[in-house]
Amino acid sequence: MADSRDPASDQMKHWKEQRAAQKADVLTTGAGNPVGDKLNVITVGPRGPLLVQDVVFTDEMAHFDRERIPERVVHAKGAGAFGYFEVTHDITKYSKAKVFEHIGKKTPIAVRFSTVAGESGSADTVRDPRGFAVKFYTEDGNWDLVGNNTPIFFIRDPLLFPSFIHSQKRNPQTHLKDPDMVWDFWSLRPESLHQVSFLFSDRGIPDGHRHMNGYGSHTFKLVNANGEAVYCKFHYKTDQGIKNLSVEDAARLSQEDPDYGIRDLFNAIATEKYPSWTFYIQVMTFNQAETFPFNPFDLTKVWPHKDYPLIPVGKLVLNRNPVNYFAEVEQIAFDPSNMPPGIEASPDKMLQGRLFAYPDTHRHRLGPNYLHIPVNCPYRARVANYQRDGPMCMQDNQGGAPNYYPNSFGAPEQQPSALEHSTQCSGEVQRFNTASDDNVTQVRAFYVNVLNEEQRKRLCENIAGHLKDAQIFIQKKAVKNFTEVHPDYGSRIQALLDKYNAEKPKNAIHTFVQSGSHLAAREKANL
């Protein structure tokens, strides 16, 4: 019904209403030349060929041919919004970062939510981790906290990342999603058990983007004004409450409204129901890290809250929708290596790998000057360096300033106060195999202590419902891993698989076929 349309559906109506007092703009080419006729090409006579001189046509088509840019290799489907971060608690004893400077300070932010494995046209309601990336526009440059909706990940070594993503994408020959690929990789890498268990729990399908938590996931380092450092983890917990979709509702929405998450976020902000998240940190001293029972930089594990409680910091609030999706969401580029003074990287191997991979893929997808794009530009800091030229240089290229360092002409100077915190590091240089690290203790705690009986039942049903489509030998490897977590975990999944495997395949697809003679008669009638 027209009178029940939501703000997202009425976007063009609202755009027109906002411009009601204005005359329509003059239609132009990309170069600003007025266009006299946008409906008809120039031809020799009404039936003749086109003329090369029809620059209105060539301008239009040449741009159309180049509208698409490379899709993100992961996190292709996403929604974005803008707002602010406000400090509510003092953590300057941990970090000198200006974003945390004083209680009440507000910093502009941009946020992008996303699924991971699907293409840009895929459904928002699939079972998949969600990206939750936050860009803080600070006076010391941008800080990009490129997180997910889970505090852990599938792997702990970045060398495995391309293979992991390949296993979640499409088969290189059939171009179909392949359960053999997915479960073969997971079953061969038992460090994935923690994230797999989280993924197939109720939280594996969040109800849109507003009702899920976010996590920096990695271990980071905070440095205060005295040069003292601690390790930390970032958490941002939804103020809307956790809500998840049932398998049935998710499947229905994937057909009826595959952009459900984008629509829900847009409409909430458009109706001034601004979503917010409370921002926390966990802190671990260097001495605590030395005596920690496992590697504190292992991305497949969490820091227990009873030992490292959440410390409140502030609020993330989203109060503006994108003005243009391509300009502000498709082109936004998050980079974990964007860290202002007071926030630094830890030895977390996965974080170290991302420090290179993210800016590298942005230079491929958006070009070497992607930081000139307005949504990526650190507009609250003055950029002054010795980088010049390159495709799509959209600013003044730093004018006549020297492009070499050192120099004697008063060009930008290094700032000792921005030096990274010094750390000691020693050990043999080699490739360390961490596959046999403890992969089950925290998963067992999640299964036994975090989930209740109904949640455990749904977890096992969800896993078996997906694993059943993999080959039997892969099923056995996966069940062996789940059994090592807890015998009940493995036995429940195996019992469900036995039931699936005993059933004969059913063809549930109903088709409607027209006879050849009927089609021939229709064709003859159209002559």
Swiss-Prot record:
PTM sites of type Phosphothreonine: T511
EC class: oxidoreductase
Cell location: Peroxisome matrix
Record-linked PROSITE patterns: CATALASE_1, CATALASE_2, CATALASE_3
GO CC terms, sorted: catalase complex; mitochondrion; peroxisomal matrix; peroxisomal membrane
Positions annotated as active site in the UniProt record: H75, N148
InterPro entries, sorted: Catalase (IPR018028), Catalase_3 (IPR040333), Catalase_AS (IPR024708), Catalase_clade1/3 (IPR024711), Catalase_core (IPR011614), Catalase_haem_BS (IPR002226), Catalase_immune_responsive (IPR010582), Catalase_sf (IPR020835)
Catalytic activity: 2 H2O2 = O2 + 2 H2O
Residue numbers bearing the Phosphoserine modification: S9, S417, S422, S515, S517
Main location per the UniProt record: other
Keywords: Acetylation, Heme, Hydrogen peroxide, Iron, Metal-binding, Mitogen, NADP, Oxidoreductase, Peroxidase, Peroxisome, Phosphoprotein
EC number(s) per entry: 1.11.1.6
Cofactor(s) named in the record: heme; NADP(+)
One of the protein's GO biological processes: cellular detoxification of hydrogen peroxide
Intervals of motif Microbody targeting signal: 524-527
UniProt modified residues of type N6-acetyllysine: K233, K306, K480, K499
Residues involved in heme binding: Y358
PANTHER family, per the entry: CATALASE
Subunit annotation: Homotetramer. Interacts (via microbody targeting signal) with PEX5, monomeric form interacts with PEX5, leading to its translocation into peroxisomes.
Entry function: Catalyzes the degradation of hydrogen peroxide (H(2)O(2)) generated by peroxisomal oxidases to water and oxygen, thereby protecting cells from the toxic effects of hydrogen peroxide. Promotes growth of cells including T-cells, B-cells, myeloid leukemia cells, melanoma cells, mastocytoma cells and normal and transformed fibroblast cells.
Family: Belongs to the catalase family.
Protein name in the entry: Catalase
